[in-house]
Amino acid sequence: MIFFAGKEKTEDLLYQAMSFMEKRQPKAAIQLFKKVTKQDPNNTIALYNHGLALNQLKKYQDAITCFDKVLDLNPKDVSAINNRAISLAEVGNTEGALEYYTKAIETDPKYAPAYYNRGVLYDKLLQHDEALDNLDQALKIDSGNVYAAFYRGIVLGKLDRHEEALNCFENIYKKHPKHMDAFFHKGIEMAELGKHEKALEIFDKLLQIHKDNVNVIYAKARSNAALDNIDEAIYLLGQAMKKDRKTIKKWAIQEKFFDNLLDDPRFNKLVK
């Protein structure tokens, strides 16, 4: 008979915590990570994953504290450096985030996630050429990174390099037929290249699966307008506005494909 239960083993606590992380239960995991570090303050695995859990809960400053503790123990922990940068970006410290992404790359020039994250941040800062350079580097290191390939297509589109963007999304969709975002953006790039009939075929297929998707409905309105299917374009634009008036109105006012609707009172009523 056992009268006094001993402390739970650190390894067992850590195993349980990581199980919660896999189940996307960061709150439960955090309680266990705290127990681990109470027993073993220098346990970098617990400290690092505690930081990841806090990031998931959007407690970014607390996450930074965890990553700093890891880096105090191991200044060359590239994952901690990279995730510290993510936390900094989330709190709006873009300068600090870029500094730490660069630090991660300097620590390990083959660490693809830092190039990818730095590319995404450059894109958000509207520095699209720098974004593309970083995404290209991420793909050079990890050619199978679907996230980097997809984001590369997005940036190419923003740079008006639509043939390259289309090729990018086609390749992703060919390898990953369930990647609906790539399929959607394939349609968008076809529209940008004036291939509206083919774009509409894609949008129709998507609406069979996601009939209420406002982005697809709006994209279909654009292509119908470009093909002078005015009544259909007006109808679809109205349907999109019912779902998200503020956003769709903003897009419609700036939309080049709606130039031929500017004299239509129905269009003006929608965007008024």
Spans of model-derived segments:
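Terminal, low-structured helical/coil segments at or just beyond the last alpha-helical repeat
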Residues: 1-12, 16, 246-272
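Canonical positions in the second alpha-helix
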Residues: 36, 69-70, 103-104, 137-138, ...
